[in-house]
UniProtKB/Swiss-Prot annotation:
The lineage of its organism: Bacteria, Pseudomonadati, Pseudomonadota, Betaproteobacteria, Burkholderiales. It is an enzyme of class 2 (transferase). Its main location: cytoplasm. It comes from Leptothrix cholodnii (strain ATCC 51168 / LMG 8142 / SP-6) (Leptothrix discophora (strain SP-6)). The gene is rlmH. This is Ribosomal RNA large subunit methyltransferase H. Specifically methylates the pseudouridine at position 1915 (m3Psi1915) in 23S rRNA. HAMAP family: 23SrRNA_methyltr_H. Homodimer.
Length: 156
């Protein structure tokens, strides 16, 4: 099973790429974390926000594996603790489908992507820069996985 972080935005600071990769490489071969960064639609075109998000939606959909579970990261999503995320991860693993975690661009995700999600999760009550989101999500997933296997990385 793969965990696919599909995020709008390609250029992030080097520290964010390094931190993300540090967590991604810790996952076992049967539970890989993979990043698919899709291009942000240029905000200088004068197009309405809905058109910009629709263009990004098309790119996100092209990156989605067939039959995957879609999990939207959204400010209105459900709050989860590390233990709850570990439980979700175990459910996802039993299900066997790849899991796509979707992170929108500067204006968020197109409404049809949000409506079509299997799950909606909230990473934080704060508005976070995209670089932080990638790193925090990778760390949270790694922490959840270590909790589920009894690894000492996570401590209560």
């Amino acid at each position: 099973m793969k965990l696919l972080l599909i995020a709008v935005g390609q250029r992030l600071p080097a520290w964010a790429d390094t931190a993300y990769e540090d967590y991604a490489k810790r996952f076992p071969p049967d539970l890989r974390l993979e990043l698919k960064a899709v291009k942000t639609e240029a905000r200088t075109t004068g197009k309405p926000v809905e058109a910009l998000m629709a263009a990004e939606k098309t790119r996100i959909e092209a990156a989605l594996p067939r039959g995957c579970r879609r999990v939207v990261l959204d400010e209105h999503g459900q709050r989860v603790t590390t233990a709850q995320l570990a439980e979700r991860l175990a459910v996802w693993q039993r299900d066997g489908r790849d899991v796509a975690l979707l992170v929108g661009g500067p204006d968020g995700l197109d409404q049809t992507l949000r409506d079509g999600a299997d799950e909606k999760l909230r990473l934080s009550d704060l508005t976070l820069p995209h670089a932080f989101v990638r790193v925090m999500l990778a760390e949270a997933l790694y922490r959840a996985w270590t909790l589920s296997i009894g690894h000492p990385y996570h401590r209560e």
